């Protein structure tokens, strides 16, 4: 017997080439029921805020917010190209939400977007604008948007903080907004973010160069990359480079990792001819050697520790090869990485679908983020449901299994 608050599950069986089935009720536990009801309520509110009707949008406004990233130019150009094909006027806002509050909104022509697809970073500028959390600043932005609100949509390209800003003006003021994920940190669940592949490609060039000099000189390199408190970028860089180890914020005990994996690996391999020693570190990963974490204090500690070790394997004679320990911080170089073909392709897919759905099915995309999956599959995730991406512990473990088996070359 079906009761309110239960799911209805249909079970199918195949007998003599025919499908048969029956329905059964499965009760929800209280926490699941509450979560589902909350989701339904919030989604109903989102759909009620959608004022655009199919075929009624006339103007499109786009901005890039937060930390810059590769691929943004390709997305912006596709928004202009596809928008014009659908008969829309397209406007860009310079320097993100800061520009919106200052009314730095410009109409865009074909000439303005020439060469934009290959532009590193954001060709229309970006900014971190913490003041946008203030209600008065949001009202200033709304005054800038006032002439466009009736028949326009705002597209926000950026990371989790920028998407929170987009959600705020959608829920508070009813702005018809769509988010496109863009961050080298790739820390948004359910999508690949613009800039991630470009950052990895540039990091790979640097790390491969460091591997070559490490193997030649017997040096040890700790390479720090950005991550905004997450290790997705560091893990991808370390895995593709076959680094000896990786320090990330998600690890429950970085100090033990330093002792067991970093120093343990060096004890086994330091002095092996033509062996590189590369460790990738996510910025601000906490450890006991420096209050700022990351590579700070770590390099000195490792250098001081290995200085106490006896002559290492692979060395003969009265003189040993010195193993210099170095820190290399890639930092903001990865934000300005030239966009890779993959990032440009993802950007164009996301931008095209954004415009198409705004024109044809606005109720499915307003108040949402467009998400990219493999095989060019585009989905939408409501802005209220955007969440942090879980760390890939399976890849982390696979990387270290190979290390323990001494498979690295």
Model regions and ranges:
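C-terminal non-catalytic interaction/assembly regions of soluble proteins
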Residues: 1-55, 297-299, 303-409
């Amino acid at each position: 017997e079906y009761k309110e608050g239960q799911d209805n599950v249909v079970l199918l069986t195949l007998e003599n080439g025919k499908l048969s089935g029956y329905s059964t009720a499965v009760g929800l536990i209280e926490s699941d029921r509450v979560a589902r009801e909350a989701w339904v309520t919030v989604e109903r509110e989102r759909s009620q805020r959608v004022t655009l009707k199919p075929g009624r949008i006339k103007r499109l406004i786009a901005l890039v917010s937060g930390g810059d990233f590769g691929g943004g130019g390709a997305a912006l150009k596709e928004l202009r190209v596809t928008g014009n094909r659908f008969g829309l006027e397209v406007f860009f806002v310079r320097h993100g939400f800061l520009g919106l509050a200052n009314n730095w909104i410009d109409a865009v022509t074909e000439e303005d977007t020439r060469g934009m697809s290959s532009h590193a970073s954001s060709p229309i500028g970006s900014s971190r604008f913490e003041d946008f959390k203030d209600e008065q600043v949001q009202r200033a932005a709304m005054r800038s948007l006032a002439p466009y609100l009736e028949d326009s949509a705002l597209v926000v390209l950026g990371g989790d903080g920028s998407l929170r800003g987009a959600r705020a003006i959608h829920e508070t003021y009813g702005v018809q907004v769509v988010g496109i994920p863009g961050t080298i940190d790739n820390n948004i669940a359910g999508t690949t973010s613009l800039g991630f592949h470009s950052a990895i490609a540039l990091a790979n060039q640097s790390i491969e160069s460091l591997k070559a000099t490490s193997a030649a000189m017997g040096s040890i390199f700790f390479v720090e990359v950005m991550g905004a408190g997450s290790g997705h970028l560091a893990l991808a860089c370390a895995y593709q480079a076959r680094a000896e180890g990786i320090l990330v914020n998600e690890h429950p005990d970085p100090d033990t990792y330093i002792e067991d994996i970093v120093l343990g690996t060096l004890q086994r391999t330091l002095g092996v001819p033509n062996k590189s020693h590369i460790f990738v570190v996510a910025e601000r990963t906490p450890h006991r050697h420096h209050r700022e974490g990351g590579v700070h204090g770590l390099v000195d500690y490792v250098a001081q520790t290995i200085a106490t070790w006896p002559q290492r394997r692979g060395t003969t004679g009265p003189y040993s090869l010195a193993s210099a320990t170095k820190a290399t911080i890639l930092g903001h170089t990865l934000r300005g990485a030239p966009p890779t073909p993959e990032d440009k392709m993802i950007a164009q897919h996301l931008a095209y679908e954004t415009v198409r759905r705004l024109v044809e099915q606005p109720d499915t995309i307003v108040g949402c983020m467009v998400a990219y999956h493999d095989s060019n599959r585009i989905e939408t995730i409501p802005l209220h449901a955007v969440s942090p991406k879980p760390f890939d512990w399976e890849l982390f473990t696979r990387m270290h299994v190979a290390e323990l088996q001494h498979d690295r070359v």
